[in-house]
Every structure is written in C-alpha cells, then in structure tokens.
Amino acid sequence: MEPRVGNKYRLGRKIGSGSFGEIYLGTHIQTNEEVAIKLENVKTKHPQLLYESKLYRILQGGTGVPNIKWFGVEGDYNTLVMDLLGPSLEDLFNFCSRKLSLKSVLMLADQMINRVEYFHSKSFLHRDLKPDNFLMGLGRRANQVHIIDFGLAKKYRDNTTHQHIPYRENKNLTGTARYASMNTHLGIEQSRRDDLESLGYILMYFLKGSLPWQGLKAGTKKQKYERISEKKVSTSIESLCRGYPSEFASYFHYCRSLRFDDKPDYGYLKRIFRDLFIREGFQFDYVFDWTILKYQQSQLTAPPSRGLVSPAVGTSAGLPPGLTSIDRYGGEEEGGRPPMDSSRRRMSGALENSGNLSSRGPMMPSSSLFAQSAGSSRRVTSEELQRCRTGAGLRNSPVVTTPEGKRSSSTRKHYDSAIKGIETLQVSDERFHHH
C-alpha cells in the first residue's frame, strides 16, 4: 500500500533534505494538488518541526507565508504538509549569472521589506535572512516572494504588553555570517534593526554579485567568522554602496541609526526605493531578469516551425526552465549558530525537485544573446517584452505619454496598484489541522 500522510496526501519522491529531516513531494489523494511534505524522525535529539509548525500557524494568513495544510505524527515521523513553492532567490540569482538588475532588485525589495515587517508584526525576529530563505511561488503566485525557514526565529516582545526583550551582549553568532548585521558580529542581542540590515546586505549582494567579505580564508569556522566580522566592520557604508544609487547607503544609515528597541519605519524604507524606481522610469510589470532570460532561452530552443513560446511555458509564469530541479540543502557556508541552537538545523522551504545546481553544468545556451551580463530589461526590445508580458499572463504597463509633471503621478499610481495586486493575492484552500 502506498504511504499516506494525514489520510489525505500520497507521499511521493524525495525532493530535498536538511540536517534534521527530509522533504518529499506529496499529492492530495482527491484533488491531485501537489504539496511539500517535511518529515522529521520523532526520535531526533532536538525536535524542530513542531516549533516551526507553531510559527507557521502564528503567521498563517500573511502574504508570502506558505500555507500549512496539516501537521501531525505519521508512524515514526513528525510531519508537516505545506505549499509547494518555486525556486529561491539564490537559485534565480545563480540562473541570472549572479547579478540582478536594479529594476529586479527594487521589485524584490518592496516585497521583501513587507515580509519582514509582517514577521515583526507577529512579535518575532527571523534572525537568518538570506537569499535561500526567500522563495518565489508557483502558478498564479509566481511573482510573489515567500519567506521561509523559521528555525532560528525568536520572540522579541510580549504579545499583549509589547514589552521588548532586554538588551544583552556577549551573544554567540546566530544566523548566516555573510548577511549578519554588524551588531550581531559584535555579540549584541538581535532586534528588528538587525533583520533589516541583513536584508540590505542581500540587496547589495544581488546588485554587486558578491559582498566584500566573501571568500575569506581561515583555518577554523570561528576564525572565518572573525575575519568576516573584521572586514564588515572596516567596510564603510559608502564603500559598500559605491557606484549604486544613494538610496542604498541611506537604507544602511537608517538601519544603523535605530536603537535596540526602536520600531523601524518600514514605510520610509519602501518609499525611498519606490521613489528611486519611479525616477529611473521603470514599470512595475513583474518582468524580472529571469523572466527575460527564460523568454530568450525559449526562442533559442524552440523548433523553427513553432510560434513564439511565452515565459508562461513550464511550471509557472516567469520562472526559468531547469529551475524545477534545484537542491537548496547544501552546506551552511558562512553560517553560525549559538551552542544551544547547534542542533536546530533546518529544511528550509519546499522545492519542486532535487539536484545540485552547481553540478548541472551551464543552464543557459552559449549564445550571443547571453554575452551581455544578465539583467537589464532595456536589453530586450519593447516588442519582445510585450510578448513576454502577454505570455506570462501579465497586464501590460500603461504607455506614458503625459507631460513630465503628470508622469510621476501616473507611474506612482501604477506602481501602487501593481504592488497592491501581488500583496493581496491570497488563496487559503484549507484550514490548519493539528493532530
């Protein structure tokens, strides 16, 4: 008899693994809906899945938070059934030759700040923000950023009184060193400001292709963390952001100006990036760099007799081919955890397939189309972009022919409408069940 979970889901092939368990593809017995099923042995020394399921339950209903279908015990395993999601931003960053355009980064930044703000509104810090922990959705949620992996999350205030946790020092590094805030490296208890600083490092990583403290050599992990810390502390904000719009430096200056228990002005941070987006003349059309690469790739691989292949071909609109087989569960490069948390490893996020991205070889054809660095939507003709948007099921951006004074207002309205549309896209098919 085929293995079943919760008497509702058929357990399929393994699609990923983590330090404390494994992830399988599941199928709803009646509807054939595909889901991700996380399994953790009940005899594991430090169970993690129950803790994570409780956080998912607290966060349920939030935009960009995976829906939990079922949690319980099946035989020897704690079991969590959740939405199947698409590739991580790290996967897509790799697909785009490890550099993203300003337009793509700004479209992502708006959603990512929203995810962090929602997480904080529920009285929790994430404490391990990195590109691997943000996943795009599938199908009609293909352009929606999801936040995952709550294994290191910590409650920072009381739900009722909003009493903030006390300031402490001499804390061990918790999270991933590459994206950890300066205060985290200095041993200061994390608060909301630190999640936002980590997010800033992610954005610069996407723009620059790497961060100055990557690739440092050391004999031990502890020595490596120390070298990363030293390099990060000695790298000024101006140096880090040199050559990029001043808004990114403003973002870091704001984050580092916050006191330990300050509530960040998330609206201000979104606003400086939105104003930059509008000033650059971008359209909020959800045509990301990977959308364009996938479209170009489809033209190279399509038989001559066939018509244009839209970016919607594949598992979801705008997702690149080949990214349905990605293993995000490799080692923890530059990651650090406190001694008490050493067993709290994670199987972050649901994936569609397994397989190591780096071992797959080149994913894009070696064509002159890809000779330029991946990124700018301006490198594709307006006609191609029109086909791209139409094929992906995206509404065309309005053609702005108004005078300069009215253009900003028109673009801002379109921007606000677009982001509101993706942020309110919510479908809850089932209620959370715990057995």
UniProtKB/Swiss-Prot annotation:
Coiled coil: none annotated. ATP binds at residues 15-23, 38. It is found in: Cytoplasm. Its EC number is 2.7.11.1. Residues 9-278 form the Protein kinase domain. GO terms for molecular function: ATP binding; protein serine kinase activity; protein serine/threonine kinase activity. Residues 313-363, 394-414 are annotated as: Disordered. It catalyses: L-seryl-[protein] + ATP = O-phospho-L-seryl-[protein] + ADP + H(+); L-threonyl-[protein] + ATP = O-phospho-L-threonyl-[protein] + ADP + H(+). GO terms for cellular component: cytoplasm. Keywords: ATP-binding, Cytoplasm, Kinase, Nucleotide-binding, Serine/threonine-protein kinase, Transferase. Autophosphorylated. The active site is at residue 128. CDD domains: STKc_CK1_delta_epsilon. It holds the Pfam family Pkinase. It comes from the Eukaryota. InterPro entries: CK1_Ser-Thr_kinase (IPR050235), Kinase-like_dom_sf (IPR011009), Prot_kinase_dom (IPR000719), Protein_kinase_ATP_BS (IPR017441), Ser/Thr_kinase_AS (IPR008271). Monomer. Casein kinases are operationally defined by their preferential utilization of acidic proteins such as caseins as substrates. It can phosphorylate a large number of proteins. Belongs to the protein kinase superfamily. CK1 Ser/Thr protein kinase family. Casein kinase I subfamily. This is Casein kinase 1-like protein 12. It comes from Arabidopsis thaliana. The lineage of its organism: Eukaryota, Viridiplantae, Streptophyta, Embryophyta, Tracheophyta.
